[in-house]
Amino acid sequence: MSDLFKNQNKDEYPYFVTHLECSEKGNDYDANEVHNLSAAGKPLLVRYDLSALKSSITKEAVAERPADLWRYRELLPVRSTENIVSLGETVTPLVSIPSPDGKEILVKDEGRLPTGSFKARGLCMAVSKAKELGVKVMAMPTNGNAGAALAAYCSRAGIESYVFCPEDTPEVNMREIAVQGAHLWRVNGLIDDCGKIVGDGKKVTGWFDVSTLKEPYRIEGKKTM
């Protein structure tokens, strides 16, 4: 077992999510229910009781925790540790690279995440929250990296996944998604065509549409970057 899994923080922490909020209208939605977009067709944002949170934790306490994505638990939407779906999301470094003008350039090396890209952050969070809310099937359109992350985390969680890729998706990405256990289709069209299939399929099958900004939780994982 890797050190990432040995050192993963298994403690429970206070939960500060208060509600979901429509990004356009500002009206509230119950964070304990499954939601995609608001009634206005806009993204839902997770809201926290920041006043209570400030009195509960310190930067120093967070810094002493294991160096992984979940060290920021109080600012994340998963209530219970048992619902965390993890593949070992380590903290990633800023790497200095040469610059023609002599100025410092820092690159965030997200390739160290479990599925090789920053997409692992968002899908780690979305799948964990989906597990907590009792979601059984998830689906998305993708050009590659997000689909691989969804497939990997759904396999870890025991959630069925469906992934739709446009015709020009590289074969290496297709194989990565397939080997992670997703139901995979190459669509004769563009990413928008894949998105339409997922949206139409949601109406028929009831699967959870985890397309970008069509659910509240992927962005919650990405903010840890």
Model-derived features: positions:
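PLP-dependent amino-acid enzyme catalytic core
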Residues: 2-225
